[in-house]
């Protein structure tokens, strides 16, 4: 995904 995140963003 564009921009790593430790959370699942929908």
UniProtKB/Swiss-Prot annotation:
Protein keywords: Amphibian defense peptide, G-protein coupled receptor impairing toxin, Secreted, Toxin, Vasoactive, Vasodilator
The protein's role, per its UniProt record: Produces in vitro relaxation of rat arterial smooth muscle and constriction of intestinal smooth muscle. May target bradykinin receptors (BDKRB).
Main location: secreted
Protein's organism: Physalaemus signifer
Family affiliation: Belongs to the bradykinin-related peptide family.
One of the GO biological process terms: vasodilation
Residues the UniProt record annotates as site (Not sulfated): 10
A GO MF term: toxin activity
Full protein name: Des-Arg1-[Thr6]-phyllokinin
Key word Secreted present: yes
Subcellular location: Secreted
GO cellular component: extracellular region
Tissues/organs with expression: Expressed by the skin glands.
């Amino acid at each position: 995904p564009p921009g790593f995140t430790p959370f699942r963003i929908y």
